[in-house]
Amino acid sequence: MNESIFLSAFNAKTMTFDEVASSFCPSKKYEELAGGWNALLIGPRGSGKTTLMKMLSLQGMRAWPADKLITRPEITYTGIFVPADIAWSEMVSALTRDAFDSRLGDLVAETAFVTNVLLSAIRTIELRVSRAASAPEFQSVTLTGSTHDEWIVHAAELWGLKPQSLSLRALTRALEARLINFRQEVRFIALQHAEFDEAQLRERIPYLGLSLIESVSQSLISFNQAVGETDHKWALLLDEFEVAPLSLQSTVLRALRGGAPELLLKVALAPCGPHTTLAEDPITGPSERNDFRQVLLWYPDRGDAEKFCEDVCRTWLAKKDPDYAALPLKEVFGTTPIAIVEDDDSEDNKVEDEPTRQKRLHETSKLFISLAEKDPSFKEFLVRRGIDPFNLAASDDVYARATIRKIAPIVAFRNAYRSNGTVGKKRGRKPYVAAYVGWGSIAAMSEGNPRWLIGMLISIWTGRYKDSGLPIPRAAQTDAARETGGAFVEMLRSLATRPTQGAEVGEPVLNIVEKLAKYFHDRLVTESFVEDPPMVFVVDSAISSAVEESLRLALNHGAIICYQGPDKSGGYDSLRGRKFRLAFLLAQQFKLPIRKSKEISLSTALNSGVLAQPGLSEMSVPSANNSATKVNATTGDKPVQDTFPW
C-alpha cells in the first residue's frame, strides 16, 4: 500500500454526501458534536472530522439511509457545511510577501473566507426551498411571491451583490462570479508587489471587509422571518479550519462567545494548529462548557474505541462480504495469541473457564521456560517473585496471577527477539507477527481512526485467499498491518519537508519517532528484565523548542497519542508536562507491543545510546538443586525454593 492509497482510503473530503452517509457509523463523539451548542472538533489527520461535519449538514441529514440501524438524530438547526479552501492561506502568503501590509492581507483573506461561507449558505438555502413544493424533505420550507423577492433584495444588499434576477439561483451565480473575480484581483495585486494602499484596494474590491458573523447571521435571521421560522437556528460547519489564516481563526474563535444566538459555530481543528498561538483573555474570551464544547477525536486507552471500530468494521463488511457482517469479529479475524494486557485488568481478563485457563498457563509456561533459559535477568525475576514456570498453576492460584498475566506479552516479545546464550543480544529482524493478528490487535492499531481501520480491512481482503475460511489467515492480517503501517511511516517521512503553517521543524518527525521506538524496543528486549518497561513518554523541560515543534506535527498527523486533553480552546499551547505514546499503528514497524506502560522523560529516551543488558545483579541466583534463596523482605518479593530444572 503506497502513501497515496493510504491517505485516500475512505477520505470523506472527496466523497459525496450520499457516499459518506451510506458508510457512516454514529458514535458518542458524533452525539457530543451534534448538540445545539457551539463546538470545537479536534483531531489528527484522518480521524473523521470531515465525515462528522458532513453528517451534520442539511445534505448529510437528507442522505441518512432509511434502513440504517441507528435513526437520524433530532437536529433542530440547519447545518451549513463549509469545506476547507487552501486558497485562503495562499492568498495571504502571496500578498504579505514583498512587504505588502499584513493588515490588508488579513482583510483580503477574510473577504475570501466570507465569500466561501456565503456561497455555502445560499446553496443550503436553495436546498431547503427548491423541493418544498413537490415532495417535502427534511427541513424543507416554502418561500414564494413578494416575500421571496423581498428576501432576495435584502440578501443582495447585505452581501453587496447585483444579481441578474430575483432568484436564489441568481444569488448563487453572483457569488460564484464574485469568487472568480476576487481571485483574479488578488493575483493582479500580488504581481504589483507593495504598490497598493487600502484605498486603492477597496476601489478594486468594493466588497472588501464584509463582516463574517454579521453578513451570515443577518441574512439567515431575515430568511427565518421570511419563511415563518423566527426561532430557527443555523450552524456553520467549518471543516479543516487550521488551514485558514490566523486572523480568520481568531475572528471565529472569539465569536464563540457573544456571537449571534441564531448562528452556532462548529469548527474542526488540528490539535496543534496555528490557532493555539493566539492569546486568550480569561475574562472576556470564550470558555469550555460555558460557550462551547470540545470534542476530541482520539482514544488514549484502546478500549474506548473498540465499540466504534466494531461498528465501522461491520458496516464495511456488510458491503464487502455480507455473510461475515453478522458474525462475531473474533470469529472472522481470530484472537491475538498473546493477550494485550493494559495497566488495569478488565473484567474480561479476570474471568475465564478452567480449560481456557489451563491452555493459557500451558502456553505461558513454555514462553517463561524458553526465556529463562537464555535470559538470566528473567530467571532472577521469577525467583524473586516466587513464580515457578514449570508449575504456573500454583503461582496463578495463590498470589502471582496478575503478574503472570501482565508480563506474558512482554515475555513473548523478549523471547522472540533475544538470541540464545548471548547477554543482551537481539536476533533477526523479522517482527514478532503473532502480536499483530486478531480482532483485538486490528482494532487497537486503528486507534479508532476510520481511515486507518478501513485501509487495513481493504488490505486484508485484498491479500486473503478467497476460500481460505475463518478466521482469516494470519498472513493476510500481518501483511495488512505491515503495509498500512509502512504507508503511514512514509507519510511521516514526508513531513520533514511539509511543516505546519508558520512552523520551523528542527528535526524530521520520523527521526524522533524512530529514536523513541528504538529506545522502547531496547528497554523491552536488551536491558535487564522488568515487568513494566516504559512505553509512554513525558515531554520534559529539557526538550528543545525545535523538538517540541516536531512533536506538534506528529500529533497533528496521529503519530503520537496524548493522554491529557488540550490546555486551551481548540488545541495545545504547549506539550510540556504531557504524557504521550506512539500510535499503535507503528507497533509492527518498530517491533513494539500494543500496550501502554510506565512513563519515561522524553529527553532520557532521545539522549539514550545503545542499551545493553548489564550483568546479573549482586543478588545470588542459585542453580537448580541449591537451597532456598533469601530475598530482601522490604521489597515485597516472596521467597521461594529454587528447584527450577534449568
Where are these regions (language model features)?
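Conserved Walker B catalytic segment
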Residues: A199-L269, E280-P282, G571
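C-terminal leucine-rich, beta-strand-based interaction scaffolds used for sensing/assembly
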Residues: D353, R357-W646
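A short beta-strand-to-loop transition that corresponds to the Sensor-1 phosphate-sensing loop
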Residues: L56, A268-G273, P450
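Conserved lysine of the Walker
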Residues: K49
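P-loop NTPase nucleotide-binding core
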Residues: K54-S222, G285-A393, R451
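Hydrophobic anchor at the beta1->P-loop junction of P-loop NTPases
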Residues: L41
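N-terminal pre-Walker A segment at the start of P-loop NTPase domains
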Residues: M1-Y30
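The conserved Walker
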Residues: R45
